[in-house]
């Protein structure tokens, strides 16, 4: 009876040990040999084979989980094993992120404190590939390290956030260049994460932008030769250079606002460097980014039913200007401070002469806006300028279309009546009249105001 109690006590002890020991339990062979299977010794786990030897440098499966026995036969924990990783419990991880302290953190500038890996379904770290994880895309290099920041993969540039996720859309990034012009620039990444590199007028959310080496362009931009053609398609862009001063034209340029959008409508800005005067503001008008400009001299453009003049530099004109006409001729025009072409009577101050002048410009028809050339309301105009005699002389001759007319200081043509007669030339009969200026010159005119003779008073 005592023997039975002793056996029960041993069995009870064995059952208790089995209850508190993990599933790593082997089978005893002899009283002095190691058990086959898992054994815990001094806090470490080992696996013994049928010869009682601890297996080393190999993976061992237990149930659904894999474990690694190192060179000392100790079950590894919380470490990388080639392309695998075992957690604190020794199990090989899968479908899981793992962070590892970066050994170079203290030795390299901008080195991350931790390196991140992702272990796939087979337990291997993802390497040299993209991976979609929980709805976001990540890239892992050849060592399996999750990448951040700007990277190049298969010739395409991408940007990964601090969390490693691939970014799309607009991103403001510091420029890695010594050029003081570029401190930081805007870049755009499409819906696959690829950076837009060199493209003219890329349409993004209804607006047009141009990129050179990925940088969004602002201000004046010289189009590549192939972009000048009206193909209607997005073009390849290359870095722009200021046009030589000798060209003096904005042909081939486009303008982009500070937010990168292609300009349309009016802008008050500096002109193209090397073409317009530096540090001066001018008015420009843009259509699809291109400035209205003359091919030579000054030309007229219609904007919202109003006429404006622009030079070859694209600068809007004000004041009295000589403008090229479509037929190859030129004409005088007048533009107010807003650049709008004026018609009818205009009083204009001539800064060069330091005097106020009276002008008249056609009010309608194909010559609208052009300086009037001829006699209107008995006032004589030459290419728009009212011809006037010096007030001290009272009268002066003016040539118009091959005839000499006599005008007074108000520009009025001096005419004879049908019944008046000339004292200086009585032989002419009726329809002539004499006018004497302050120099005692006598001018004889007919009913049209055409001078018939000039004599000195006796």
What is each model feature region?
Residues 2-458:
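Extracellular adhesion/carbohydrate-binding repeat motifs centered on closely spaced tryptophans
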């Amino acid at each position: 009876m005592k023997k039975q109690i002793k056996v029960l006590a041993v069995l009870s002890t064995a059952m208790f040990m089995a209850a508190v020991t993990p599933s790593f339990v082997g089978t005893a062979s002899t009283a002095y040999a190691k058990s086959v299977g898992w054994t815990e010794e001094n806090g470490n786990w080992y696996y013994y084979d049928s010869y009682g030897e601890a297996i080393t440098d190999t993976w061992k499966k237990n149930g659904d989980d894999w474990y690694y026995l190192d060179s000392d036969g100790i079950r590894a924990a919380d470490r990388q094993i080639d392309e695998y990783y075992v957690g604190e419990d020794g199990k090989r991880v899968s479908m899981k992120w793992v962070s590892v302290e970066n050994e170079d953190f203290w030795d390299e500038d901008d080195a991350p404190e931790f390196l991140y890996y992702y272990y796939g379904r087979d337990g291997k770290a993802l390497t040299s590939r993209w991976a979609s994880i929980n709805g976001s895309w990540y890239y892992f290099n050849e060592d399996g390290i999750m990448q951040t920041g700007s990277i190049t993969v298969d010739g395409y540039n991408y940007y990964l956030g601090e969390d490693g996720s691939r970014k799309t859309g607009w991103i403001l990034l510091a420029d890695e260049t010594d050029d003081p012009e570029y401190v930081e620039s805007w870049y755009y990444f499409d819906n696959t994460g690829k950076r837009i590199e060199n493209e003219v007028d890329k349409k993004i959310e209804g607006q047009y932008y141009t990129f050179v080496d990925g940088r969004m362009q602002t201000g004046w931009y010289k189009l590549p030769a192939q972009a000048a053609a009206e193909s209607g398609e997005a073009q390849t862009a290359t870095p722009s250079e200021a046009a030589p001063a000798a060209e003096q034209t904005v042909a081939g340029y486009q303008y982009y606002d500070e937010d990168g959008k292609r300009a349309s409508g009016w802008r008050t800005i500096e002109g193209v460097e090397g073409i317009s005067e530096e540090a001066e503001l001018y008015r420009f008008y843009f259509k699809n980014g291109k400035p209205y400009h003359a091919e030579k001299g000054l030309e007229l453009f219609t904007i919202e039913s109003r006429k404006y003049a622009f030079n070859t530099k694209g600068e809007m004109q004000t004041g009295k200007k000589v403008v090229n006409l479509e037929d190859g001729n030129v004409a005088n025009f007048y533009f107010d401070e807003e650049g709008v072409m004026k018609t009818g009577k205009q009083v204009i101050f001539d800064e060069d002469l330091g005097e106020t002048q009276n002008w008249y410009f056609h009010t309608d028809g194909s010559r609208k806006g052009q300086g009037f050339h001829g006699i209107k309301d008995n006032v004589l105009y030459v290419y728009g300028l009212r011809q006037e005699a010096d007030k001290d002389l009272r009268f002066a001759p003016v040539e118009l279309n091959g005839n000499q007319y006599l005008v007074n200081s108000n520009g009025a043509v001096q005419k004879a009546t049908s019944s008046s007669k000339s004292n200086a030339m009585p032989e002419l009969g009726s329809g002539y009249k004499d006018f004497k200026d302050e120099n005692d010159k006598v001018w004889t005119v007919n009913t049209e105001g055409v001078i018939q003779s000039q004599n000195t008073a006796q």
